[in-house]
Amino acid sequence: MVYFQWEIKPTKNRRTIMKNRKLILAVCAAMIMSMASCASSSSNADSSKAESSSQTESSSVSESSSVTESSKPDSSELTDNHHKYDNMTAEQIVAKLSLQEKANQMALPQILGLSMDSVKKNCYGGVLSKISAQSAADWRTTIDTIQKNAIGSQTGIPIIYGQDQVHGIYVCYNSVIFPHNINMGAANDKELMYKVGQITADESKLCHTLWTYSPCVAQSVDPRWGRTYESYGSDLGRITELSTSFTKGLLDGGLIVCAKHFLADGNVKYGTGEQGDIKMLIDRGDATLTDAQADELMKVYKAQIDAGAQTIMISHSSVNGVKMHENKKYIDKLKNELGFKGFIVSDWNSVQNTSAKTYEEQIINSVNAGIDMFMEVDTADEVVSTIVKAVGDGRISQQRVDDAVTRIIRVKQEAGVFSDPMFEKLETKQKDVGSEEYRKVAQQLVEKSMVLVKNDNKTLPLKKGTKVYITGPAADHAQAQCGGWTMEWNASPRREIDGVTTIQKGFEQLAQQNGITVITDKSKAAEADVVLLCVGEQSYAEWNGDTEDLALCGKLGLEGNKEAIKEAKDLGKPTVACIVAGRNVILDEADKKNWDSIVMCYLPGSEGQGVANVLCGNAKFSGTLPSPWYSDVKQIGTNDCWLKKGFGLKYE
């Protein structure tokens, strides 16, 4: 492990501090990624090297120092502090708290750099997870230590620990990594989505994490958006049905749900991306909506509220030029017209990108707009002091603070956090993450989410006795197969990930029982009857995936795509192209013509044997495109496309 020591000259300017900090973290990440690349041939998006640390906070730098045995209060300190609230309503609890204690409940600092003394002193409303992986046992230790300090505090209110469960417990070793939401949209199976919710809840509880920042209910309308794969697609009806089923599974499994990102994060216009320290093409941009269009998007959130979602996260983006973190119009609609009784949480440091000139004004405006808890990851104490001061001078009303904290306390009470903060009554269906039972469900989703878009000469399914040459950079690449938000935020530099069966390994496992010979040696490729060409995109997250170039062999294409495509063509064999990507990438017309079969796999996650099952005919194609597939970026936003939403061939 490499450590870096840096010295920054003191400054009173908070923005300068943040900018310097980001620069240091970016340099650290770039150096680490550079070293990792020497041992791996995988290639991540260039921009991720500089920016992934703004999320992961360079987790290699002694993250364990803030959670230690010495931080834990002794048992005498834990006896009664949270039990004093046992017979009180949320309103009664809030009435007992000082203004300082109330403001602390509105803060959501990140665990990295957070001392347990600070948790015990301030008793924050929640703690945001780090975005790097560890074992389930280590997660339990980490979260239990924080909770012991919270309930051992004078205030004694338990925290809720929040984590992005984007496609399973992606920061836990050996957990089930489900296909991404774009696959869920292609599968379009409500019953399976409910099961995914239950499994995610069970594995999350095995890590002692109760608050999940999911589902993402974005309507993805432009594939150039880097978060396209986090969406179920472009059809609002499909998004509503699938996300609601998922939410019900999470809730029945015992989690606190957070629907996101309110409002219109997937409807932003290309070219309006946020222009701060990082220049984005589309992410966090502006959506131009009529009232009728906004009302249609609100229906998805109404369904989430009716299903029981307890929290909603605000989008980084804007609607009609107003940042959602200060957009009182729509937040009021959420609480008043849609009847949302839970609490609203901000997204990562996004208050800092609102219109006010000072951070103090930004916080005040966001509170008054209706945000209840603040994910300002390393300025939590500044958020708290600003709220206290603003109530004192009348810029924030006491009523607004009481409403926010009542909502937070109510969610904690109803989720059982007060009655069992240390998970002593915890019940899970499995003893550990990554069970075979849960992997089978993930494999089912892989099989149902694959979309067959071309199958000339009935090349598929592969027949017994077929010799298959497997080639291409996505064939045996766990990270490419799982996509972003896997082990880390933007992507792990490793090709191999614990518990992941790649497409190639899946074929090798099934070869004998299906009477198929798998060839991976280039020198023997000419012996093959069929070429299985596995190509796709690099892994990325958020704005790192924003691109004007959607070509399969473009800026975000996997290194080796071009060479593998040429190799397959030169062999002159029937070719099955498997596309492993987070969106409908643009294919070369000649390639579309040359390939006998084309299969869109999207990002199938850990169970790559599901791909082999379908191609060998053990399972049938049933997936359909969740969004249109364009032939050219010029078609985006028009009715012209290569394949329409809902298209998908099946075996005859």
Regions found by a protein language model. Give the residues of each.
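Bacterial N-terminal signal peptides that target proteins for export
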Residues: 17-25
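Short, Lys/Arg-enriched N-terminal segments with co-localized hydrophobic residues
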Residues: 1-17
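Glycoside hydrolase catalytic-domain context in secreted enzymes
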Residues: 41, 63-65, 69-652
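Short, low-complexity, disordered segments immediately C-terminal to signal peptides
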Residues: 39-71
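C-terminal motif of bacterial Sec signal peptides marking the signal peptidase cleavage site
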Residues: 34-37
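Repetitive helical segments and hydrophobic/amphipathic motifs
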Residues: 30-31
